[in-house]
């Protein structure tokens, strides 16, 4: 597999509905499902779940 196929760049969009996003990379071999991380949303002013958007 090429480098870009194994660790693609993904967007993490806030579930609070603010439209705030984080950009990161993930390893598809270790995390084949959609990623969900709890991170700080400055627009909401609190920690919320961020879901992977491809």
Swiss-Prot record:
Gene3D superfamilies: Ribosomal protein L33. One of its GO terms (molecular function) is structural constituent of ribosome. Keywords: Ribonucleoprotein, Ribosomal protein. HAMAP family: Ribosomal_bL33 (MF_00294). NCBIfam families: PRK00595.1, rpmG_bact. PANTHER family: 54S RIBOSOMAL PROTEIN L39, MITOCHONDRIAL (PTHR15238), LARGE RIBOSOMAL SUBUNIT PROTEIN BL33M (PTHR15238:SF1). This is Large ribosomal subunit protein bL33A. It comes from Streptomyces coelicolor (strain ATCC BAA-471 / A3(2) / M145). The lineage of its organism: Bacteria, Bacillati, Actinomycetota, Actinomycetes, Kitasatosporales.
